[in-house]
Amino acid sequence: METVIKLTGINKIYRTDEVETQALENVNLEVRKGEFLSIMGPSGCGKSTLLNIMGLLDEPTSGEIELCGMKIDPKLSDNRLAELRNKTLGFVFQSFHLIPTLNVLDNVQLPLIYRGVRSGERIRLAKEVIERVGLSHRMKHRPTQLSGGQCQRVAIARAIIGNPEILLADEPTGNLDSKMGAEIMELLHRLNKEDGRTIVMVTHNEQQAAQTDRIIKFLDGRQIM
């Protein structure tokens, strides 16, 4: 099966004054196309750092990243990295990161504005993905008028509007109660199965991780399973 993310010998060291902290140590990982992968481990073990490196939001201190068959040159400009992210990756975060002054429709459109998509096409595509996440009746609402689960649905709609091949989710149910968390997991599974979309999810929830295709565990920056 095709590999869409390949990490080879990834190390990440944070330096503050004279103190060095190794967040990741010699990580070697392949993610297959269409896979739903969970990354688990205690707080501070490097899970989110790993996801940020996969998502080209952070650079490793050493090691190689390959994304959809393309080796990522560490000398790539910020603009080129942003272009790759916008084309290939969708991001879902624990804290939603919605713009509070914009309604649902406008929040979901944002990635297409950065791509230069025309207004009419943006609105059409935004309405399609909003309907898909079950929020057509909330299109004109702002985030403060929505529940936590609804805000996360908006964030997922925004993440998939550009039809990215890979969805990276950092604790997507972490701020939700168990019922809303289960609904978000059901939505993610639907996106995985119906679209063949690759999903990499960081989670503390063992029950939710057990529903995915594969679990990778980290401890102190090292992959242990």
Q: Which functions belong to the PLM regions below?
A:
Residues 2-219:
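ABC family nucleotide-binding domain
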Residues 220-225:
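Conserved switch/coupling elements of ABC/ABC-like ATPase nucleotide-binding domains
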